[in-house]
């Protein structure tokens, strides 16, 4: 009820201004009596995935907590894990504004943010300071001005810097808002990236005496042959997990709605069915060889359960959280 009242005011603001205001307030309220508006104690639903113990299988997807500024606040809401980022080697401003749009009637969001972030060094400092007893995943990407043929270098730089502070590392090669990025999902480019990531993981595991899993985040806009090739590469290079899916470029499910023609990736309820189909197909292709983190349109415990029945070991929320608030986490955890 409280969130519904707050949302009415928040949704009168520009979407990005509302996001920035929320982050500022979470930072300001955390640890004060005002955090009662979002703090909630949930039942424990522990699960082990990628060799990591999660206190529950519901996580915050990357993109909302880009710089790791208020990890404790999201932890207080009951998330079993929080994925921060996407972060790049160097700070970057991202794409021109406006770049974030609500499709309220569809409970969707279109973004063309472009990996705006304060850089990997800033993120690492925030993660080091965070007092959160859950799992922190760190989502890494490449800078916009790094040529795509040198993109792997950016991932390796980020991986080296975040490794000892991450519960797991997510490799984002599926954002539609960085030119050329999605080409890394295919053929030799993917194999070269995964090969070098695994080599770096082995080197860092020996250096720090701990094994940090890596998970590949893929797009929903892949046909069956492309999914099959990705699955083969994931197994070939013994990648620890796959995150399905990122946002879509498809607009067929929101045609005619306000903001539907905006460039960028569409998330939320409109991609619920497609992302679940990708999870199901990946499960058929991968079997039990590696776990799947399902994300895309998870806006209720029913939607979360559908992802898990399709084959997801963990699920993440983003757009559903924007529309439903912290109670969404409680509803999913209590009923999953």
Swiss-Prot record:
E.C. number: 1.3.5.2
GO biological process, one term: 'de novo' pyrimidine nucleobase biosynthetic process
Gene Ontology molecular function terms on file: dihydroorotate dehydrogenase (quinone) activity
A Gene Ontology term for the protein's cellular component: plasma membrane
Top EC category: oxidoreductase
Keyword Lipid biosynthesis: no
Function, as annotated: Catalyzes the conversion of dihydroorotate to orotate with quinone as electron acceptor.
Family listed: Belongs to the dihydroorotate dehydrogenase family. Type 2 subfamily.
Protein name according to UniProt: Dihydroorotate dehydrogenase (quinone)
Reactions this protein catalyses: (S)-dihydroorotate + a quinone = orotate + a quinol
Membrane topology according to the record: Peripheral membrane protein
Active site location: 175 (nucleophile)
UniProt xrefs under InterPro entries: Aldolase_TIM, DHO_dehydrogenase, Dihydroorotate_DH_1_2, Dihydroorotate_DH_2, Dihydroorotate_DH_cat, Dihydroorotate_DH_CS
